[in-house]
A protein has these predicted regions:
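Short, well-ordered beta-strand core segments
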Residues: 77, 113-114
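Histidine-anchored nucleotide/phosphate-binding helix
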Residues: 19-38
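Short, glycine-rich nucleotide/cofactor-binding loops
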Residues: 6-20, 52-53
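An anion/phosphate-binding loop that grips the pyrophosphate of nucleotide cofactors and donors
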Residues: 110
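A glycine-rich helix N-cap at a beta->alpha junction
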Residues: 55-83
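N-terminal beta-loop-helix "entrance" segment that forms/cooperates
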Residues: 44-58
Length: 116
């Protein structure tokens, strides 16, 4: 049986390669039917914001990767409700908002945790 993996994405989408790398890891795991989850935390919640203009910052758009999560069978997508509120954002339907206490409990369910 495969060990479960939670990937925590803490970086804004255009602040460096970490956001893309987190999505790449999750999508690769999903392609191999691994039990995998994704948590957006801190500035990582900016990846969930609608209407981002990647061309304005000369970056590749991550929206398609986010939309592909469900196609790869990745249903465990979470967002820190405190991080969302601090940044004036709301979670899209594709991400379940969790409190700090819920995040702690959820992390305990995974065998391995990777933070990017």
């Amino acid at each position: 049986m495969s060990r479960s993996l939670l990937v925590i994405s803490r970086q804004a989408p255009w602040s460096g390669p970490s956001a893309r790398e987190a999505l790449d890891v999750v999508l690769a795991g999903g392609a191999f039917d691994l039990p995998i989850g994704l948590l957006f935390l801190d500035d990582g919640v900016f990846q969930l914001a609608a209407a981002q203009d990647a061309k304005a910052v000369q970056q590749k758009d991550l929206t398609a990767n986010l939309q592909a999560l469900s196609l790869f069978g990745i249903d465990d997508v979470f967002a820190c409700s405190h991080s969302l509120a601090e940044r004036g954002l709301t979670a899209p339907d594709s991400a379940q908002p969790l409190s700090s206490a819920q995040i702690s409990q959820m992390i305990d369910r995974y065998d391995q945790v990777m933070t990017l």
